Amino acid sequence: MPKYNVSDFKSKFDKELTNHFNKNGYKQSFVFEDIRLLIAIACIIPAGLAFGIEYVYGFGVLKSYLKYLLPLYFLASCLLTFWSSVVKGSTVYVATKKERHIKISADTFLPLKNKPLITTKFTVLKNRNAVQLEWSVPVAHIFEEDGQISSATFEAEISKYLSQIEN
């Protein structure tokens, strides 16, 4: 794997993490993505209206509507940015299993040093009680030289840690 390609590193790790939980009987929830989609549609509506008004009636008529459409677009765009960066943040996976809710926030840290660690923060909700757990694993243990995740090693590492979440 290229030494400085943190985004490839993070996306491969997040995908493997999601696949692991899906294989182990967790039912994934897409609430964050659904809400983000609705907010994105709310951004498109004022822009589409502006385009339609200009196309049909011309820019002269559009000017009187812009004072309403631009603030709507701006607010929807700000809400989308807030939702994506603050509310959803780095959450990779939200799922339930046997009345347990698990929210996985994966903050990947890849410092430029010889032995970087990947750290994943888990929030497990059960009976309205939240438990914070953190899992760190050396990158060299789960990634091979060519940049692919060693599935067997990844499964072994996370299975050791998963017993804490399951109990």
From Swiss-Prot:
Key word Transmembrane present: yes
Bilayer topology: Multi-pass membrane protein
UniProt keyword Chaperone, yes or no: no
One Pfam short name: SPC25
Key words, A-Z: Endoplasmic reticulum, Membrane, Transmembrane, Transmembrane helix
BP-aspect Gene Ontology terms: protein targeting to ER; signal peptide processing
Family: Belongs to the SPCS2 family.
Protein name as it appears in the record: Signal peptidase complex subunit 2
Originating organism: Schizosaccharomyces pombe (strain 972 / ATCC 24843)
